[in-house]
Amino acid sequence: MESETLTPGETVTILDTEFCKIGVAICYDVRFPELFRNMTLAGAKLILLPGAFNMTTGPAHWDLTMRARALDNQIYFAAVSPARDTEGPYQAYGNSCVANPWGEFCGRTDARESIVYAKIDLDYIEEIRNQLPLLKHRRPALY
């Protein structure tokens, strides 16, 4: 299990680029939506997440969690995975993807070695947030 092998970090990583603020996390982090909400509130518009879900968690959770993190925060969420090596000791799910602020995939691969290309439209983030102002309607005093 990942939590038995890796040590958790102590800080949130957000890169301030000329394009936008980019949050960076790793595989197991995707299970904690609060992390990505904090990144979003700090101004992140894109999250990059390398991950290597296996053939149990991948089919059940990969698409769902990546789309949910994008939708919940109305951001772009790019998750990259190793290609599946059927001869290797670890069977990665693969399926690298980019989800948009509406929770749809705008770039996706399968389990083979490949490259994902996706358009990251920062104006689309604002369009979605204006249509459905989730961040403005939060009630942090209640929860």
PLM features: residue spans?
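C-terminal beta-strand edge segments of enzyme domains
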Residues: 82-143
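Short, Asp-centered acidic motifs that coordinate Mg2+ and/or phosphate
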Residues: 46, 76
